[in-house]
Amino acid sequence: MIFSFFLLSFLLSCLSSPQFAIEKEEKKLSRLICMKGLLEPRELSHFFMQENPHADAQKVWALANFYVKEAQDEGINSDIAFVQMCLETGFLRFGGLVSEDMNNFCGLGAISREEPGLRFPSMEIGVRAHIQHLQAYACTRDLQKELVDPRYKWVQPRGKSPSIYGLAGTWASDQAYGEKLDALLERLESFLLTNCCSKKIFFF
């Protein structure tokens, strides 16, 4: 009995030790757009598949990798860009003016049935256009890659929305747009905290 008591006490002390606490440390994601994202494609993909388990897992995995890579190249927060894609496409359910085959993941140019939005030749280029458009809203520095966003020049003044909250009434007419992005980032943070020890990948 005494041995069992001390064993239990030892295990409890281990679970409360710093190395175990690190496993449960919450990742606080920045709401600033011009900075490096924290999350890996695996984490973004895992979150996405929980929100829409019927999505094409291979496509989600590819998108997550494109977002992390393209955002890193332009100094943009990939966590925000990926979450914005989730909001704009309804986690790739679409259903609005933009259709899946357009490779338009942020509603670029979507105004009406007559102007349903821009079409891009591949997922990679569609993601790049999204990142470039975010860069125009959040930063004043030059692009690192060739311009593929036809609407880039229409963002004036450059750098007017350094955080997600500045996208309300600018990127989107919805005055609650920034709050919706914030709510999605909070969901992502909660997901990471709950699933911090999970290494499951849905794809391979």
Where are these regions (language model features)?
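Bacterial N-terminal signal peptides
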Residues: 4-13
